[in-house]
Curated annotation (Swiss-Prot):
It comes from Mycoplasma genitalium (strain ATCC 33530 / DSM 19775 / NCTC 10195 / G37). InterPro entries: DExx_box_DNA_helicase_dom_sf, DNA_helicase_UvrD-like_C, DNA_helicase_UvrD/REP, P-loop_NTPase, UvrD-like_ATP-bd. Belongs to the helicase family. UvrD subfamily. GO terms for biological process: DNA replication; recombinational repair. Has both ATPase and helicase activities. Unwinds DNA duplexes with 3' to 5' polarity with respect to the bound strand and initiates unwinding most effectively when a single-stranded region is present. Involved in the post-incision events of nucleotide excision repair and methyl-directed mismatch repair. It is an enzyme of class 5 (isomerase). PANTHER family: ATP-DEPENDENT DNA HELICASE SRS2, UVRD / RECB / PCRA DNA HELICASE FAMILY MEMBER. It comes from the Bacteria. Its EC number is 5.6.2.4. Keywords: ATP-binding, DNA damage, DNA repair, DNA replication, DNA-binding, Helicase, Hydrolase, Isomerase, Nucleotide-binding. This is Probable DNA helicase II homolog. Residues 294-542 form the UvrD-like helicase C-terminal domain.
Length: 703
């Protein structure tokens, strides 16, 4: 550890704030602080609470702490996410268990399906709810106001439908809340709200829990939202020993409730002296050339936020190479993708970097879909299965919830996941005298002779319930894995989780397992195979890769501007911070790409690129089509003049011509543009590629 870290770790009691820049070892600092308190200050580990944001981060923290303290103390450590801590608190306090069901999007689809709203409009609102509403940590009294705000956000220029939509959404929310109460369910933001309500309304309970924890450590504090901050303040009521690690320049979750200026608010609330503030700026992740670019963006953020510009705010590293980050501007999305593919393959073959240690980062989710299609067409880069894994887990969770609650909505959702729900079944249910879907399924199984073709599948759900009631858990999950076609990788992980969960238990609790599964989604589906990482920048926060490609640095895309925020300075700052986070995910190689046109429409490069002194800090890829896997990029002694690889005259090529590439073999021309041709290569490893007509590697061939 360096001196900056040592000073922070060995600080005294009270509220201490550690400003730890990207890659400066936040986890190292917080885990060593935990160990310092136990080993040096002789604090009982059961009286230390460490909180972070993801299950994966919590597991990593626990793993590191147990290497620093006596292993016999493992059972006494309290390392949680905010949600898992609140879940434990509610179980211990209320002496009852809840089912965590955060699938608000399904509920809203069901509710809005019967409305007269335009289907595209309804989908737009559902997507907004899915992306933002489920993360709002709000007082119940503010919900109507937030819903109205969300309507305004989604319905610009749709005044005639606004009133209807507002009413529909508020009614949907009320129904959603009632459904949870009736079925003993909580969503993730309920966990926090219930915990805070109980603590704020019961002084004895507050004293008990704030007395229990002598020290509280919080990682990534800049990402906390208002209710999380209120929870922390209540938990330090007695002892007031709080150790916070964060970086305000990486605050990228304002859109889901993180409070801008939360660190400033805390300093005011707790009257934190300057002596209790620590600045860590030695980066252990990135090459100094990458940090030079990051610091250019950091200076702009500081200028916008009127921060004092000092050296302690800028990052430095002792990791130095002569490889500058590369900026590449392609003529089209396809050219951009091909260039990225070839660089990835070159890194894999020449630098021996595994695919899993490389990432393509996107500002928008929909760009990932486009890239997946292009990678599949290329056929040479292995794709991750995280999205498929996530969908499989969601379906499994839906079925388990239905087995537990047996409500109409949950059973219908489960039958859809099992591909049993059909129009015939729906019609027969309407015709029957059964209002409860579970009763109807039992009735239908007994009456299959009358409607055998339509009801033959309904007995399957009843079988699942019988297996659960008889505690035949292994048979239950074997059936589910087979029916839902769960991937072997996920199946193996779930069997392991089931084994661990059932250890020392005399009876299997389905609701308890559902909650455990919901709290660990992120750690179950993490990428463990050697496949390329395709992530939004938000999803990449906290991760690091040997090589990073920042995709689509174009104005309007990154920064992403919608009509309602194009003149919003705070939004611009948020986008700059997002760019800073993207840059600092890279350890050795950084590539930034943009395009000149999309769908034949010209598009400008991102204005953020103007904040970087390109001639000093970037290598500019001046040719848009470097098709070969070029070793020269990795050899600092070679400076390639790509213009030497072009003819003065372009080939005269038409659709249907047979051509030969020196690098990819024979292929057929399937599309021709002014300067380039799209070639479908016979070797399926290469798929289709755009090639400049005047590239020397391309020649016409004879049939």
């Amino acid at each position: 550890m360096n001196e900056q870290q040592k000073q922070a770790i060995s600080c005294g009691k009270g509220v201490n704030v550690v400003y730890s820049g990207a890659g400066t070892g936040k986890t190292t600092i917080i885990t060593n602080r935990f160990a310092y308190l136990v080993n040096k200050e002789k604090v009982d580990p059961s009286r230390i609470l460490a909180i972070t944001f993801t299950k994966k981060a919590a597991k990593e923290m626990q793993f590191r702490i147990l290497k620093l303290i006596d292993s016999s103390l493992a059972e006494k450590t309290n390392i949680y996410t905010f949600h898992s801590f609140c879940n434990k608190f509610l179980i211990q306090t209320l002496k009852k268990r809840f089912i965590i069901d955060d699938d608000i999007s399904y509920f809203l689809k069901e509710f809005l399906a019967d409305s007269k709203l335009d289907i595209n409009l309804a989908k737009q609102i559902i997507d907004n709810f899915k992306n933002t509403f489920a993360d709002f940590e709000i007082n119940k009294l503010d919900q109507d106001e937030r819903l109205i705000s969300l309507c305004e956000h989604s319905l610009l220029n749709k005044d005639e439908e606004y009133s209807t939509l507002k009413t529909q959404l508020i009614n949907a929310f009320i129904s959603y809340e009632k459904n949870k109460i009736l079925n003993n369910k909580l969503d993730f933001h309920d966990l926090l709200i219930k915990t805070c309500n109980l603590l704020s309304n019961d002084n004895d309970l507050l004293n008990q829990w704030s007395e229990q924890f002598q020290h509280i450590l919080v990682d990534e504090f800049q990402d906390t939202n208002q209710i999380q901050y209120e929870l922390i303040k209540m938990l330090v009521t007695k002892n007031k020993n709080l150790f916070l690690v964060g970086d305000n320049n990486q605050m990228i979750y304002r859109w889901r409730g993180a409070v801008n200026g939360i660190i400033t608010a805390l300093k005011h609330d707790f009257n934190v002296p300057k002596s209790n503030e620590f600045f860590i700026n030695q980066n252990y992740r990135c090459d100094q050339n990458i940090l030079a670019v990051a610091n250019q963006i950091l200076l702009k953020i500081m200028a916008y936020e009127k921060q004092v510009k000092t050296e302690k705010n800028l990052l430095f590293s002792t990791l130095n190479s002569d490889k500058k980050p590369v900026y590449f501007q392609a003529e089209s999305v396809e050219n951009q993708a091909n260039w990225i593919f070839n660089k990835i393959k070159a890194l894999n073959q020449t630098e021996k970097i595994n695919f899993k240690d490389m990432a393509i980062l996107f500002r928008k989710n929909r760009d990932i879909t486009t890239m997946v299609e292009l990678i599949e067409a290329d056929g040479t880069i292995p794709l991750p299965k995280q999205k498929s894994y996530f969908n499989q887990l969601v379906k499994l969770q839906r079925v388990l919830i239905a087995i537990s609650t047996r409500t109409n909505l949950d059973i219908k959702r489960a039958l859809q996941a099992l591909k049993i729900w059909s129009n015939d079944l729906k019609e027969l249910w309407k015709q029957s005298d059964k209002t409860n879907l579970f009763d109807f399924l039992k009735w239908s199984e007994l009456n299959q002779k009358n409607h055998s073709s339509k009801l033959k599948a309904t007995g399957y759900f009843n079988l699942l319930i019988k297996l659960a009631e008889d505690q035949q858990i292994n048979l239950l999950f074997t059936e589910l894995f087979k029916k839902l076609k769960v991937d072997q990788t996920i199946e193996n992980l779930l069997w392991k989780k089931l084994t661990e969960f059932q250890k020392d238990k005399t009876e299997f609790s389905l609701s308890e397992f559902i909650t455990s599964l919901a709290l660990e989604f992120d750690s179950i589906i993490e990428n463990s195979s050697d496949t390329i990482n395709l992530l939004t920048v938000h999803a990449a926060k906290g991760l690091e890769f040997e090589a990073v490609f920042i995709y689509g640095m174009n104005q309007g895309d990154f920064p992403l501007f919608l009509s309602q925020n194009q003149n919003d300075e705070q939004h611009l700052i948020d986008e700059l911070k997002l760019f800073y986070v993207a840059i600092t995910r890279a350890k050795r190689f950084l590539f930034i790409t943009a395009v000149l046109q999309i769908n034949n429409n010209s598009i400008k490069p991102s204005s953020f690129l103007n904040y970087i002194n390109k001639s000093e800090y970037l290598d500019i890829a001046t040719i848009n089509y470097v098709l070969e896997q070029d070793d020269d990029f990795f050899d600092s002694t070679k400076k390639t003049d790509y213009t030497k690889k072009l003819r003065k005259e372009s080939l005269d090529i038409i659709v249907g011509d047979l051509v030969t590439s020196r690098y990819f073999g024979k292929g057929v021309v399937v599309e021709v543009r002014d300067k380039e041709v799209l070639v479908a290569f016979k070797d399926t490893r290469y798929g289709m590629k755009w090639i400049l007509k005047n590239h020397k590697s391309l020649t016409k061939a004879l049939y």
